[in-house]
Amino acid sequence: MALVNKIKTLSSVGILAATLFLAGCQAQSNILAFTPPAPSASMNVNRTAVVSVTTKDSRAIQEIASYTKHGELIKLNASPSVTQLFQQVMQQNLISKGFRVGQLNGSNAWVTVDVREFGTQVEQGNLRYKLNTKIQATVYVQGAKGSYNKSFNVTHSQEGVFNAGNDEIHKVLSQTFNDIVNNIYQDQEVAAAINQYSN
């Protein structure tokens, strides 16, 4: 009887140890989640333009970062996608400034957000790492009376000891993303161009 109890105990301990080992070996997610901050602008009710917003992703590289860990190349992607993030940002921006966002056919002004860069370059040595992030987007306004464009750019760098991973990359890229979003929210030139060039 004592032998049976010892076998049961050892089996339970073995299963627990194997479970913990396998849990520790699970692959880290290659998705980094982003949430745009909310705009703080007060609504201007005198806006008459109905604006159609589209976003396109012109980045040369689709992942937002890549690095090597234990000899394996890790490629990171954004969730929501970069296109969805900037679509949400621009729609929130225009609504907060009093514009109505409409469909392509029912609008008298068209805004296109062209995302040119959104990513982190990872440099890793034996004892230090360096992260360089850059986000660049150009906003195009088209109306019956003319067109306008403006570029938004934000860069950040971070250095640290040993190797960078998802958490470090996410932290510096989130800071860069929040900064460019706030720059878009604080900008008044795009709203002025919509008013000027819409019919």
Curated annotation (Swiss-Prot):
Keywords noted in UniProt: Cell membrane, Lipoprotein, Membrane, Palmitate, Signal
Protein's cellular compartments: Cell membrane
Covalent lipid adducts (N-palmitoyl cysteine), residues: C25
Signal peptide annotation: 1-24
GO cellular component: plasma membrane
Lipid attachment residues per UniProt (S-diacylglycerol cysteine): C25
Paired cysteines (S-S): none
UniProt superkingdom: Bacteria
Membrane topology of the entry: Lipid-anchor
Family as reported in the entry's similarity comment: To E.coli YajG.
Name listed for the protein in its UniProt record: Uncharacterized lipoprotein HI_0162
Source organism: Haemophilus influenzae (strain ATCC 51907 / DSM 11121 / KW20 / Rd)
